């Protein structure tokens, strides 16, 4: 937990999900502080205030009195925003949470943008803004100085209008943009490409990992996916759904659950099944979720996972660990977790300690495909459908 002192208010902020090492990673950064110092609140006239990419809810908490709309592609960020509003005893209903695929409010007076990691997502958001902004909309964006590039500024100028940047402060930089009536060519909603060795065409929304081509880890994983599984299979952290798409083809008697914390990932997965295997839609479920929260314990026969090893810019295996714990809770006895991961991450020993077993199915110079089986004698993981309450140090 960390404290942000803004002069007129002080906020206690925590990263989400809470981690044992959370004291070493604060839930806000200098760009948040710089933005809040440079917003002229006297100009807010009752029209909507719109915030983008507020990772842990810092901006939403600071601006809660103005009833902001907060747009994010991350379900985890939405959970973090709600968590920090509660932590500061602020009214959760004062902040309207929007997903990246939701419509934006018309004619906002103030737009505050944290520059996202993916330039494609920023372009999508700026194009969506262009459709709703008014001539007097105030637009201010911020990020670490290293993340504000000429290409970033050019994107604002091309889509919205004249743009300038500030001097750096605490290694952060701001962008000020004015709305102008400038011509802009249309752009497709998705990037499409053929999936190698298949007749499938893959469609990716802006914030999908490896948007422009097949992820090399997924490519390796897909080569050894199982056949003829019955029961329910989960593609956990599904991204664009290519792993689940192949699993759906190879397991005609199974049901498929596609789950990710990214709204655009789940939308891409659903689109890819709709376009490529419409006959199998009735066997599919698509869920935006924090891991497998909301999935009943002991309901899955197989979990397929290509876990991330970072949360935004911070390198961490906490998200992967939560996925593994969720998989153990949700698998039936005899059910299997199959993952692909970089060799250097040492998932083998982590899975062996968690499940009591782990097998290497295949490996190359960069990746390993591992399998763990849930034993009938596994200790109780608790009831209900929430995430497994288990810390890394327990194993």
Curated annotation (Swiss-Prot):
One Gene Ontology cellular component annotation held by this UniProt entry: cytoplasm
Lineage: superkingdom: Bacteria
Alphabetical UniProt keywords: Cytoplasm, Methyltransferase, rRNA processing, S-adenosyl-L-methionine, Transferase
Catalytic activity: guanosine(1835) in 23S rRNA + S-adenosyl-L-methionine = N(2)-methylguanosine(1835) in 23S rRNA + S-adenosyl-L-homocysteine + H(+)
Intracellular or extracellular location(s): Cytoplasm
InterPro entries per UniProt: DNA_methylase_N6_adenine_CS, rRNA_m2G-MeTrfase_RlmG, RsmC/RlmG, SAM-dependent_MTases_sf, Small_mtfrase_dom
One Pfam family it belongs to: MTS
Gene Ontology MF: a single term: 23S rRNA (guanine(1835)-N(2))-methyltransferase activity
EC number: 2.1.1.174
Primary subcellular site in the record, as a coarse category: cytoplasm
UniProt xrefs under NCBIfam families: PRK15001.1
Entry's family note: Belongs to the methyltransferase superfamily. RlmG family.
Biological role stated in the UniProt entry: Specifically methylates the guanine in position 1835 (m2G1835) of 23S rRNA.
Record's protein name: Ribosomal RNA large subunit methyltransferase G
Organism annotation: Yersinia pestis (strain Pestoides F)
């Amino acid at each position: 937990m960390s404290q942000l002192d803004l002069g007129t208010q002080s906020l206690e902020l925590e990263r989400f999900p809470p981690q044992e090492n959370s004291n070493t990673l604060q839930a806000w950064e200098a760009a948040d502080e710089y933005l809040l110092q440079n917003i002229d609140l006297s100009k807010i006239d009752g029209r909507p205030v719109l915030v983008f990419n507020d990772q842990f809810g810092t901006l939403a908490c600071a601006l809660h009195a103005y009833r902001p709309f907060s747009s994010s592609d991350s379900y985890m960020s939405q959970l973090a925003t709600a968590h920090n509003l509660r932590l500061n005893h602020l009214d959760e209903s004062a902040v309207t949470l929007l997903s990246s695929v939701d419509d934006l409010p018309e004619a906002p007076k103030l737009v505050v943008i944290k520059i996202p990691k993916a330039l494609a997502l920023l372009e999508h958001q700026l194009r969506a803004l262009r459709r709703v902004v008014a001539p007097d909309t105030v637009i201010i964006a911020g990020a670490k100085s290293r993340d504000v590039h000429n290409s970033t500024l050019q994107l604002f100028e091309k889509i919205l209008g004249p743009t300038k940047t500030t001097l750096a402060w605490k290694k952060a930089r701001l962008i000020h943009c004015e709305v102008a009536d400038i011509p802009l060519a249309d752009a497709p909603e998705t990037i499409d490409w053929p999936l190698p060795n298949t007749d499938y065409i893959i469609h990716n929304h802006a914030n999908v990992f490896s948007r422009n081509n097949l992820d090399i880890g997924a490519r390796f994983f897909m080569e050894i996916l199982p056949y003829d599984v019955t029961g329910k299979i989960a593609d956990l952290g599904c991204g664009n759904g290519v792993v689940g798409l192949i699993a759906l083809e190879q397991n005609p008697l199974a049901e498929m659950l596609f789950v990710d914390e990214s709204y655009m990932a789940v939308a891409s997965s659903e689109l890819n099944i709709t376009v490529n295997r419409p006959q199998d839609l009735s066997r599919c479920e698509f869920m935006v979720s924090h891991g497998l929260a909301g999935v009943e314990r002991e309901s899955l026969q197989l979990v397929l996972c290509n876990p991330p090893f970072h949360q935004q810019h911070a390198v961490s295996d906490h998200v992967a660990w939560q996925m593994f714990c969720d998989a153990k809770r949700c698998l039936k006895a005899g059910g299997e977790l199959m993952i692909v991961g970089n060799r250097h991450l040492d998932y083998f020993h982590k899975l062996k300690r968690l499940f009591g077993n782990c097998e290497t199915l295949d490996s190359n110079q960069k990746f390993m495909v591992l399998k763990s089986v849930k034993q009938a004698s596994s200790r109780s993981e608790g009831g209900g459908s929430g995430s497994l309450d288990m810390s890394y140090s327990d194993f």
